């Protein structure tokens, strides 16, 4: 993960640091529906196959070698929009958003509770939010 932090720090443009906002899966779903949020599922392909992917999240495996280029492409294609990151329980998305914030990225949110929930926050699935069961790009 340290390598990821260094790569992101070098590749992402600098900006003023702000605290990363945290939202629930339901809030993320509503923000996506209103057009104000682009949702990124940062779990692994194995996890995507097991549960499906939140609708309409873009799957980008945060452990893959092409994570940074794919994220940069997504950011470039969605200027001015907030990007929300979701994982299984909220741990990885919390870590990633902290790293991205330290690298200077703004307009990002952490979707707490993730897809499965974490005992404190109900996850995307338990909230009954829509899931794609088959991922053609995973």
Across the structure, where does each feature detected by a protein language model lie?
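Rhodanese-like catalytic fold shared by cysteine-dependent sulfurtransferases
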Residues: 17-34, 45-82, 91-138
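Structural scaffold elements adjacent to functional motifs in cytosolic proteins
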Residues: 39-41
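Short, surface-exposed ligand- or partner-binding patches at beta-edge/loop junctions that are enriched
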Residues: 86
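Bacterial N-terminal signal peptides
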Residues: 2-15
């Amino acid at each position: 993960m340290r390598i990821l932090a260094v790569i992101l720090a070098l590749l992402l443009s600098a900006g003023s640091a702000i605290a990363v906002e945290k939202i629930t899966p339901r809030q993320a779903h509503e923000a996506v529906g209103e057009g104000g949020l682009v949702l990124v599922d940062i779990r692994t392909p194995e996890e995507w196959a097991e549960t499906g992917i939140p609708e309409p999240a873009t799957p980008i495996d945060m452990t893959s070698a092409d994570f940074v280029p794919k994220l940069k492409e997504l950011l470039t294609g969605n200027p001015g929009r907030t990007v929300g990151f979701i994982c299984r329980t909220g741990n990885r998305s919390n870590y990633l958003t902290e790293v991205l914030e330290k690298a200077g990225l703004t307009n990002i949110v952490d979707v707490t509770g993730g897809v499965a929930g974490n005992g404190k926050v109900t996850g995307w699935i338990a909230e009954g939010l829509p899931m794609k069961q088959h991922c053609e790009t995973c």
